[in-house]
Amino acid sequence: WQCALMAPTEILAEQHFRKLIGWLEPLGITTAWLTGNQKAKERREALAMVENGEAQLVVGTHAVIQEKVHFKNLALAVIDEQHRFGVAQRLALRNKLTHDGMEPHMLMMTATPIPRTLAMSYYADLDVSTIDELPPGRTPIITKLVNEARRDEVVERIRAQIAQGRQVYWVCPLIEDSEMLDLSNATQTHSDLSLALQHERRPNGELAQVGLLHSRMPADEKKTVMAAFKEGRMAVLVSTTVIEVGVDVPNASLMVIEHAERFGLSQLHQLRGRVGRGVAASACVLLYSTGDAPRLSESARARLRAMSETNDGFEIARRDLDIRGPGEFLGARQSGDAMLRFADLNHDTALLEWARREAPMLLDRHPALAAKHVARWLGGKSEFLKA
């Protein structure tokens, strides 16, 4: 049998691959690596290993679910940072085992369940395990809401962090200027911060470096920038959301998220989680702007309020569920109205829990009747309940 592990970014997938290689190679277990940036020869060899069963574990990005990938016997599919994938993508991985009516076991992991996932954990066939405590040595992150007008104060705070030998993330919603959106971009912010911090020195006397990271950079350049930041040679990293997952720098103690009102709750929580990984007190600054409007929208205010009030991923998900809705259970939308015909997720919890307990008995004792019931109400869309 084979296992597959799919991660949303190459940075995270490669971290998993290197760690698993170290654990599994001594046991004689072969691990294959699949990503969109592989050279043709390397990719052909990996695909052959997957198809003939030589690769017992396959680690990769979205490349794992492409049509050319054929598993011999997929028994377990692991999806890391599950909230970053769409319903169709998760189904595509599950459908990689198609013979004899069998389906692979699925393990989905996330620090921030999206509305659909949280609702599915309540009402679908999804068992949930929760780790609700910080790892040893971690400190809770303080979250502050700061108006864009106080931007200079945030830069002063960065200077203080640099003087203490700490490192800082600054996240922007765009890579470059957009004619459609009046938002700060990573390229300009990198230029501005480089100028503002050009004379700042770290405790060892070296001038503070300000780096830039975004998805359009060549893979080698991205690796070079990330290595410099991880090794502590770079004090400030200006980035887009490519650092949302898979980046672990214990010395980073300040996260600044620009135009925080434009980000979703799960994304904000994931970005905040890039700091607070060491023993130093850490903070997340949510810079917000109302633009031409007199105030933020109700949903934006609700998101920022949730971030300032809790660090709990499941509580964040519950707030997100209230704000956005659970999405379609029998479709691909992951937020919005549930579109249930009779039930109401908020008011019928007790009845739905009872139905969930009784359903296995009905399926076991009256399979023909249950099949008719499923066909009538689900209309051939039951596959969506598995993702």
Describe every region a protein language model picked out.
Residues W1-R305, R365-L369, A387:
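Inter-lobe coupling/hinge segments of SF2-like helicase ATPases
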Residues G291-A387:
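C-terminal accessory region of SF2 helicases/translocases
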